[in-house]
A protein has these predicted regions:
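C-terminal substrate-binding subdomain of Rossmann-fold SDR/epimerase-dehydratase oxidoreductases
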Residues: 2-143
């Protein structure tokens, strides 16, 4: 989304964008995985969640606003059949057993993520110019 927004490309949003996801900053996710590897019980499953559920459309609009881009870039595409409206993550176990909680507030994490895209444009533009672009076009063509 951020790359498309920076390049003034369509921002595909499934259905009306009402799908809810639990958002977590990548460094918090990595720290949780590291903690599980070091202190988790072998064979156990630990859900990693941010306690931060938001609608997809709200995230996309937030990105547009942060980058001073028009919401007219948002393109509503046909939702996948059977697409879940909400992905709920219950991270109670990792908190209770390992003491993990996310450290980064959503507002800070999204700003850091956007800043990363701005500071590393050469890197990610090379990636999306190749095979990924072909995949992206196959996935969203005609939707």
């Amino acid at each position: 989304m951020i790359a498309n927004c920076l390049n003034d490309k369509p921002l595909p949003v499934y259905g009306k964008g009402e799908n809810v996801r639990d958002w977590l900053y990548v460094e918090d996710h990595c720290k949780a995985i590291d903690l599980i590897i070091r202190k988790g019980r072998v064979g156990e499953v630990y859900n990693i969640g941010g306690h931060n559920e938001m609608k997809n459309i709200d995230i996309v609009k937030l990105i547009c606003k942060a980058l001073d881009k028009p919401e007219s870039l948002i393109t509503y595409v046909t939702d996948r059949k059977g697409h879940d409206m909400r992905y709920a993550i219950d991270p109670t176990k990792i908190h209770n057993e390992l003491g993990w909680l996310p450290e980064t507030k959503f507002a800070d994490g999204i700003q850091k993520t956007i800043r990363w895209y701005l500071d590393n444009r050469d890197w990610w533009e090379e990636i999306i110019s190749g095979e990924y672009q072909n995949y992206y076009e196959r996935m969203y063509a005609g939707r």
